[in-house]
């Protein structure tokens, strides 16, 4: 099989796999589509078995880390952390939609950074719906904030997003160094979102005519907070003590899951589902498909397009092209394709890629799996959104957030 034919076939398989992930037909799980696509490419010779195995081994630690963080997030839900966050938002806002939006911004940013964007989408969004209903105010600004902050605030830590984990392992940065470099870009992106949201949703943020009763002071679940503190401290010290962060994540998952099993407040089957094995298998299959595309010439094409320098102009170009690519093929395959190229060019290009693939997906529905998941959460709440409104909001936030975050990344790299 010629390289051109192999690349064309691989891109076709990638397109079909992503279409299944977006549409999620009940008769064809996304994991099955990705695995079938990867096996097919091995069978037709588009990628050798050894290269496919290498791709799976390279993704192994990332997959293990993600599974552990999903279990920690599920444990925090079970311990009542998200319900406490909802009560805190309702009490602190005092009936003001503007203050409620501020609380949602802060809490969504923190949850995204610490527990991952999936926790914000799946666990916080329903709480926001309930909180807004209790306050008798429109939930639209706050629900949109969950979607946008899940993407924009996921720049901060390696654990915040699967895309970050992929870049983290490729960049060879320590956990603390990664967070230090991405702190200012994250603040910049969130600040842009806040400014735009206040103006875009001005009519929805008017004070309601009737304020609901003020909720009682919430009590944070101390055990869940302690597990999170232990896990994050372990991440911060991982490079100092010479232990991979995945082991601290595994310890945190065990610490919050084993007592629940002992108390019979959960079961092994429930825990297995919480780890989302279907999604993890999908990522592994997708990794093989993207690797097949890379070895058949896609990496050469990417290298020809992306700058390799770390000047402000280069970083802006990398972030912009990464955002465009994420909205064309979704940010997960975009990261798998782009990070090996940009990480080889240095820390700056690799992190600029993350700005593009994390912030950029707020522009369209298909830009990230988190946004697609957010739409499914809205359907369970009998809520829908207007495509035009979503696109207008993205057009206002994404370019400005990309610019601000990339400029501050460039400044952070100079320190």
Model-derived features: positions:
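Interfacial loop-to-helix junctions that mark the boundaries of transmembrane helices
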Residues: 1-6, 25-28, 51-62, 173-185, ...
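Alpha-helical transmembrane segments and, especially, the helix-loop junctions at the ends
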Residues: 112-122, 139-172, 193-198, 326-339, ...
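Juxtamembrane and boundary regions of transmembrane helices in multi-pass small-molecule transporters
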Residues: 137, 176-219, 359, 363-366, ...
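Membrane-interface alpha-helices at helix entry/exit sites of multi-pass transporters
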Residues: 95-103, 133-146, 173-184, 346-356, ...
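Membrane-embedded alpha-helical segments and adjacent helix-loop junctions characteristic
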Residues: 49, 53-140, 279, 284-346
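Structural signature of hydrophobic alpha-helical transmembrane segments
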Residues: 2-12, 57-71, 113, 117-121, ...
């Amino acid at each position: 099989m010629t390289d051109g034919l192999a690349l064309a076939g691989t891109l076709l398989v990638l397109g079909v796999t992503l279409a299944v992930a977006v549409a999620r037909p009940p008769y064809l799980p996304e994991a099955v589509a990705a695995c079938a696509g990867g096996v097919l490419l091995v069978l037709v010779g588009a990628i050798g078995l050894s290269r496919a195995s290498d791709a799976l081994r390279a993704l192994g630690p990332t997959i293990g880390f993600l599974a552990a963080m999903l279990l920690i997030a599920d444990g925090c839900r079970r311990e009542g952390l998200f319900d406490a966050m909802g009560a805190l938002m309702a009490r602190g806002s005092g009936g003001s939609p503007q203050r409620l939006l501020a609380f949602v911004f802060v809490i969504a940013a923190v949850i995204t950074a610490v527990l991952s964007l999936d926790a914000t989408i799946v666990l916080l969004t329903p709480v926001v719906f309930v909180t807004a209903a209790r306050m008798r105010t429109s939930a639209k600004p706050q629900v949109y904030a969950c979607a946008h902050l899940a993407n924009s605030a996921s720049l901060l830590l390696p654990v915040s997003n699967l895309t970050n984990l992929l870049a983290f392992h490729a960049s060879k940065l320590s956990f603390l160094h990664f967070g230090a470099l991405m702190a200012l870009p994250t603040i910049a992106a969130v600040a842009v979102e806040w400014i735009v949201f206040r103006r875009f949703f001005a009519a929805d943020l008017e004070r309601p005519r009737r304020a609901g009763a003020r909720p009682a002071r919430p009590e944070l679940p101390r055990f869940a907070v302690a597990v999170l503190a232990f896990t994050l401290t372990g991440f911060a010290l991982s490079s100092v003590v010479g232990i991979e962060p995945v082991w601290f994540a595994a310890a945190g998952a065990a610490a919050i899951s084993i007592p629940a099993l002992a108390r019979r407040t959960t079961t092994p089957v429930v825990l297995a589902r919480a780890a989302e094995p279907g999604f993890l298998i999908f990522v592994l299959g997708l990794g093989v498909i993207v690797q097949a595309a890379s070895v058949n010439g896609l990496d050469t094409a990417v290298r020809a397009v992306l700058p390799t320098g770390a000047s402000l102009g280069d970083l802006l170009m990398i972030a912009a092209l990464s955002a465009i690519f994420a909205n064309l093929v979704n940010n997960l395959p975009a990261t798998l394709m782009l990070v090996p190229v940009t990480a080889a060019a240095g820390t700056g290009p690799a992190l600029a890629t993350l700005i593009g693939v994390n912030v950029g997906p707020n522009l369209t529905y298909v830009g990230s799996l988190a946004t697609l998941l957010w739409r499914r959460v809205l359907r369970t709440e009998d809520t829908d959104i207007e495509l035009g409104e979503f696109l207008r909001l993205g057009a206002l936030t994404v370019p400005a957030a990309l610019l601000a975050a990339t400029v501050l990344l460039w400044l952070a790299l100079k320190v």
